[in-house]
């Protein structure tokens, strides 16, 4: 996990530091006629953000990860770890709970704590928890998941122990490479399970979201990014409500939208690519990143990467694109564990895996060729 600054947690420290800095800067430094403001205007910063799809944990995955008296998922991420770690910020959807033993898969997920440990080891910096499985282990699971993430110091958003915690930490504001990024996450539902007080789940509620966006704007961010959990499962194209919500989010001031939930890939757009800010990214669904699902279009997913520069106080999206990944299952590979495999890595797959991967890639390629807008491979 890369070093990032959580500004909500650092506020109390900033005042004294600024006071000292102002005192030290009060005297002129010989020969330096450039003000701090002018130096800031002249500086160019860069930032890369990578977002991956759904991190699931079905029973066969739990069994495959068993190692001695614990669990080991490092092999799952070995082939994509370099790409994840190369990004300045890497984000994924944590679509399980850490409810403690007994561990279980579908329909109510509760994964071993080692799963979170190895996700962080792979290079992920931020996890979203606002999804339809966040209450699978009920109140205990929601609170324990938050506790484990806090104990491992991984920033997260979407679910909260109480209103005070949400007020402190949401929207999630992070600082990296001179950029301030405000993140939003919300879900369409929680599989019929009701959140118990004082816990909070961020649901899709436009009145609430509008207020959250305004709060984000008040944080003076360079970017506002929404990470919605929405859509229709297994549908390759977004439904009208998703399109309408995306348009509404952009109209309220969100810069980029990267969603998930359908467990399959859906189209990607770069709107207004010729604009001064480089445009606005809209990804409806990144599909499955790691799971045991095996229907044709659920066997893989993708990562998207967004590159930005900040010059003279202005932020511009300079490049964006997707990378396809295939989830190799032991049932096909003959190997012990599940593995996320970039689709270009032929040497890592046997013929059975290649056949399944090829079918997935062909469908994704045709879908993107028909519906993507100014959004190609990275």
Please identify what each model-predicted range represents.
Residues 11-12:
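Repetitive helical segments and hydrophobic/amphipathic motifs
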Residues 16-19:
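C-terminal motif of bacterial Sec signal peptides marking the signal peptidase cleavage site
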Residues 21-378:
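Acidic, metal/ion-coordinating pockets
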Residues 1-4:
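Positively charged n-region of N-terminal signal peptides that target proteins for export
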């Amino acid at each position: 996990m890369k070093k990032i600054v959580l500004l909500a947690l650092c506020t109390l420290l900033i005042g004294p530091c600024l006071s000292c800095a102002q005192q030290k800067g009060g005297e002129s430094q010989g020969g330096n006629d450039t003000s701090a403001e002018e130096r800031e205007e002249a500086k160019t910063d860069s930032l890369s953000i990578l977002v991956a799809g759904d991190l699931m944990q079905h029973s066969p995955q739990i069994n495959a990860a068993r190692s001695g008296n614990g669990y080991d998922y490092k092999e799952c991420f070995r082939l994509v770890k370099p790409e994840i770690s190369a990004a300045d910020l890497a984000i994924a959807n944590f679509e399980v709970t850490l409810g403690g033993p007994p561990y279980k898969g579908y329909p109510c997920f509760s994964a071993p704590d080692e799963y979170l440990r190895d996700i962080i080891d792979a290079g992920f910096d931020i996890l979203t928890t606002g999804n339809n499985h966040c209450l699978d282990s009920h109140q205990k699971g929601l609170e324990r998941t938050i506790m484990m993430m806090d104990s491992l110091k991984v920033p997260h958003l979407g679910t909260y122990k109480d209103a005070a915690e949400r007020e402190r930490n949401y929207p999630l504001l992070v600082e990296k490479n001179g950029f301030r990024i405000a993140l939003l996450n919300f879900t369409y539902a929680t599989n019929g399970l009701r959140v118990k007080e004082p816990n909070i789940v961020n649901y899709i509620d436009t009145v609430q979201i509008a207020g959250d966006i305004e709060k984000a704007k008040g944080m003076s961010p360079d970017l506002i990014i929404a990470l919605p959990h929405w859509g229709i499962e297994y549908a390759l194209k977004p439904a009208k409500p998703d399109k309408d919500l995306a348009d509404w989010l952009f109209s309220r001031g969100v810069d980029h939208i990267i969603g998930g939930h359908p467990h399959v890939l859906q189209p990607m757009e770069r709107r207004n690519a010729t604009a001064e800010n480089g445009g606005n990214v809209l990804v409806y669904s990144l599909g499955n990143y790691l799971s045991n699902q095996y229907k044709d279009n659920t066997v893989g997913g993708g990562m998207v990467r967004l590159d930005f520069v900040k010059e003279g106080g202005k932020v511009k999206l300079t490049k964006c694109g997707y990378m396809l990944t295939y989830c190799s299952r032991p049932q096909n590979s003959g190997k012990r564990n599940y593995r996320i495999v970039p689709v270009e890595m032929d040497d890592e797959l046997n013929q059975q895996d290649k056949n399944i991967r090829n079918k997935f890639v062909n469908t994704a390629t045709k879908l993107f060729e028909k519906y993507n807008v100014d959004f190609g491979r990275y």
